[in-house]
Curated annotation (Swiss-Prot):
EC number per UniProt: 3.1.3.5
Organism: Ehrlichia chaffeensis (strain ATCC CRL-10679 / Arkansas)
Chain residues that bind a divalent metal cation: 8-9, 42, 94
Name of the protein described by the UniProt record: 5'-nucleotidase SurE
InterPro entries per record: SurE (IPR030048), SurE-like_Pase/nucleotidase (IPR002828), SurE-like_sf (IPR036523)
Source domain of life: Bacteria
Amino acid sequence: MKVLLTNDDGFHANGIKVLKEIVMAAGIASEIWVVAPLSNCSGCGRSVGLRHAIEVYKVSDTEFIVNSTPSTTMFLGLKEIVGEKPDLVLSGINSGVNIGNDVTYSGTIAAAAEAAMMSIPSIAISQEYDGRSGEINWENPRKFLKGIVDMLLGAPSWDKSTVMSVNFPLISAKGIKFTSQGKYMPYNKIEKKKNAASSISYTIHRTAPDKDSRGESDDSIRALDDGYVTITPLKFDMTDFDILESLMLLNEGCNI
């Protein structure tokens, strides 16, 4: 099986190195490629590089660095770099979870979505970490990821245009739960600084809200807080079909 690894934290991030170690140790791939951004692109969502030259650096025959966003990196990886399309794309392991409303900001999920648009099985992988110490424990992915990949690839109901988003908790995981995305808006602290000139600079700091305000029992937010690995299927047709149906009924009675 040909597996393509990518991320949004950058080619030199620890998470993608750990991911490659896990894939190699699991023996699930006969061919492993790494195509990742040059620098950290956290929070860039599905932004793309247009109308300017994008440099690609060859590290080895199967490892490449792209000086662009995760979505662009994946697009070029699939269209120009890896040749025959991979059997699986793994995006991560992201430093920090991608849950609730954060999924639309996530470059990790965006890279996986780019592959899913081409009907390639794609899994976005994220690891919660201690925001105070900054330490990341990779034991949960090492323990659970192979089994999760095997299980998902064997799922006949998996529409390959759907991204599977896997989030690992900070503590030793109790098990796995399939969950909904949930609603989660992190607390944003804005630091304001007046510069010597006439400009003002702002720094936005993102922190998690109190756990009591974080989610329902069946969503990824609450399940993570309870110590479970969460698996959430994400589709990127963002149409609200309930509202669409009501608007279509409304339109029937209008003379516009």
